[in-house]
Every structure is written in structure tokens, then in C-alpha cells.
Design a protein with these regions (language model features):
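Positively charged n-region of N-terminal signal peptides that target proteins for export
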Residues: 1-7
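Bacterial N-terminal signal peptides
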Residues: 7-17
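A phosphate-binding catalytic loop at a beta-strand-loop-alpha-helix junction
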Residues: 131-142
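Cys-dependent protein tyrosine phosphatase-like superfamily
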Residues: 21-131, 146-188
Length: 188
């Protein structure tokens, strides 16, 4: 688990350092002019019922998210995440999408965080808003979305499990196992 998380954090750091270096030199113009798709958004996975999950999108990828018909974004990452965008709320709302930030500490997720997420999802789903849920790498987003889709929407475990969550389950630490074990009564 530690090796996997360290590898993931190192990969994200390299990705964003290289991207920042390219932006400084102006070499991203050629990259940005190439056609990107939702598949280019880190760990993107479209779920059922107008819900998708992802890792941290780049500023330019939020336009792709809008073009993919998502009208709301929920960010579960903390502001101190290595790849966080300090102006993400403005980027998203400037594209006429709604933005909700529910910072969930990686090492201390709680039932209260899940409850706030459920309430936000209920509000957005009541408005028939397709929602993209993201965090730094799609781990938090996958767990919270899984809980919502199984407990609130009645989807099967198979339908609600992202490929990333399936891979992570055997390595998950006790904090996240506790979140996975929550019942609806524990959350409400």
C-alpha cells in the first residue's frame, strides 16, 4: 500500500512539474491544440445515472467535462493536495457549471464527510444535474460515489465499482475500510 501510494504521488508530482515546465516554455501550445477527450482526464470513469468520477482535471479539461454534458463538479480533495487548483471554483463556475468543495482529508475520512457528500449529491440529482466527482487521483471520489450509488441509488456493487476502486480494495487502509463498511444509518 505504501509503495503504491508513494508511486502514485511521485507520478502525479512528475506529471505536474513537467506540465508546469512546459507551460513556462510555451511548449504546451502544440499539446493543447491536439484533440483531448474525457479519456485524457486522470482516472476518469463514467458511472451510470449521469455520474462520473476522476482524479484532478487540468484547467483545460474542465471544458471537456462541460462538453461531456456534466453540469456540476464535486471536489473531494483538500486544498493542500499536490495537484490542487487554487482557482478551481472560478474555472468551473466560469463554464456555467456548479461547483461544490467537500475537503476530505486522505488520512481521516469520516461519516460526516460522507453525509455532506450524500446531501450534495441528493440536491444535484434532484436538479437532474449530471455530476463529475473528483479528488486528487479518484480514490476518495470512487469510494464516496460507490457508497452513494449503492446506498442511495440502489445500484449493485458491480455497477457502482470503478476499476480503480476494485484494484484498491485489497490494499485499502483501515480508515477507508471503515468508510466502505458504513451503513445508511451510520451516515444519516
Amino acid at each position: 500500500m505504501k509503495f503504491s501510494m508513494l508511486s502514485l504521488l511521485l507520478a502525479m508530482l512528475i506529471y505536474f512539474c513537467v506540465g508546469h515546465s512546459l507551460a513556462q516554455t510555451g511548449l504546451t501550445d502544440d499539446v493543447d491544440s491536439q484533440s483531448e477527450s474525457m479519456a485524457d482526464v486522470m482516472n476518469y470513469f463514467p458511472m451510470t445515472n449521469g455520474v462520473g468520477t476522476a482524479g484532478q482535471p487540468t484547467p483545460a479539461q474542465f471544458a471537456l467535462i462541460k462538453a461531456a454534458k456534466y453540469s456540476a463538479v464535486i471536489n473531494l480533495a483538500v486544498a493542500q493536495s499536490v495537484n490542487a487548483l487554487p482557482n478551481e471554483a472560478k474555472i468551473v463556475t466560469d463554464l456555467d457549471m456548479s461547483y461544490q468543495h467537500i475537503p476530505v482529508p486522505w488520512d481521516a475520512p469520516t461519516a460526516s464527510h460522507v453525509k455532506e457528500f450524500f446531501e450534495t449529491m441528493d440536491m444535484l440529482r434532484h436538479q437532474a444535474s449530471p455530476v463529475l466527482v473528483h479528488c486528487a487521483a479518484n480514490y476518495r471520489a470512487s469510494v464516496f460515489t460507490y457508497k452513494y450509488l449503492t446506498l442511495r441509488q440502489g445500484l449493485s456493487k458491480e455497477e457502482a465499482t470503478t476499476p480503480l476502486l476494485k484494484e484498491w480494495l485489497p490494499q485499502m487502509d483501515d480508515n477507508w475500510k471503515a468508510i466502505m463498511a458504513l451503513s445508511l444509518n451510520d451516515i444519516e
